[in-house]
Amino acid sequence: MSLMTKLGFRALVASCLIAAGGAAHAQVNVLITGVGSTQFPIATANFVNEASLPQQVTSVVRGDLARSGKFSNVDAGSTPVPETASVDFGAWKAKGANAFVAGSVNREPNGQYKVNFILYDTVKQQSLGGLSLTTSNDNEGMRKTGHKIADYIYQKLLGVRGVFNTRLSYVQRTGNVYKLLISDSDGQNAIPALTSKEPIISPAWSPSGTKVAYVSFELRKPVVYIHDLPTGRRYVISNQKGNNSAPAWSPDGQTLAVALSLTGNTQIYSVSSTGTGLRRLTRSSSIDTEPFYSPDGKWIYFTSDRGGAPQIYRMPAEGESAGAAQRVTFTGSYNTSPRVSPDGKLLAYISRTGGGFKLYVQDLQSGAANAVTNTTRDESPSFAANGQYILYATQSGGRSVLAAVPSDGSAPPQILSVQGGAIREPSWGPFMQ
């Protein structure tokens, strides 16, 4: 199979091999398949007054912490505990909890709800602070509040910003219908941004988290669009002769790198976020595709078969006219789909290994690379905004699913799937503004 066939149409070919049926954007199921080697035991008591809510905030918090693989939920019992209550640190420590969360939900005169909570360190017997959050009394509002609380806990106890209150984009295929879906980080609250009878591939979040670029085949050829999520407006960014594919945002959100077959072999170009100022960046006789900007905006990583087989290279963001491309991957003979971590230290990519395709992570300073999954049909990696996790597409039980794995490979992947449908092409959104 040629590099163009493998990369340019991988999602289309894969999805056509999957028989799918069932309801549109069905509920996503999350299967926790493993946990980290070290977990922080925490007890989250039921919040006062939350029992009658359409969505209990604490169930979202516990679910987020469990899915992270970094925490173990200690049974806090069924009795609600307000944040104003005095804390018996010894009793909670005796239950096995090194941290404890208490809180309440109260209706405001304007109909909104105030959610208050405090996080306690039971070992040091001290408060780690808390938040007072205002939300609407609906499923979406309460879930978002729960994600914010989990983010607070994650950062206070682990020293790293949490990503529970972020969003995912991915493509679901049900029969001959394709949907570009936007969901919470746990796959819940999925909302279709686009529905089409033609394939949709390569969604990519803007740095602001308000736009998603993607490739649609609705014009009977691949065309790059940008979708403005708050307004629902979408517009064409690249509809050049031949294939238009693989959009990638610059860190400032002003430019996109795209792969175009405008002159024959696919090459990498840049274009403004308004669709103007097309500029060619690579000038090789090979296939150059799958561009991705480094977080500092100085480099573009990309896949090329200029060495005979696909490998990952990088060049100055201004293009090869500003400096020759340099090969980056040397482990394995077939490497594609480069994605750089938000701190610029790690490179995630897909490597053909033993007849399968596995997600690898390479330290960009040392060059050391290791597989981080136990699956063998991996594709489309995407780092979480904090760099701690990688979302990717794979196969599980004969179905197309999404999976999330710690970027250091310290725990098995967690599977996100839908009943009767195939989900692919994931992209993990940035921190919410």
Curated annotation (Swiss-Prot):
**Signal peptide annotation:** 1-26
Record keyword Repeat present:
no
Give UniProt keywords alphabetically: Cell cycle, Cell division, Periplasm, Signal
Give compartment(s): Periplasm
State the GO CC annotations.
periplasmic space
Q: What is its main location?
A: periplasm
One Pfam family in the UniProt entry: PD40
Q: Does the keyword 4Fe-4S apply?
A: no
Q: Which GO terms describe its biological process?
A: cell division; protein import
InterPro entries per record: 6-blade_b-propeller_TolB-like, PD40, Tol-Pal_TolB, TolB_N
Which family is this sequence assigned to?
Belongs to the TolB family.
Please give the function described in this protein's UniProt entry: Part of the Tol-Pal system, which plays a role in outer membrane invagination during cell division and is important for maintaining outer membrane integrity.
Q: How does it assemble?
A: The Tol-Pal system is composed of five core proteins: the inner membrane proteins TolA, TolQ and TolR, the periplasmic protein TolB and the outer membrane protein Pal. They form a network linking the inner and outer membranes and the peptidoglycan layer.
* PANTHER family the record matches: PROTEIN TOLB, PROTEIN TOLB HOMOLOG
UniProt protein name: Tol-Pal system protein TolB
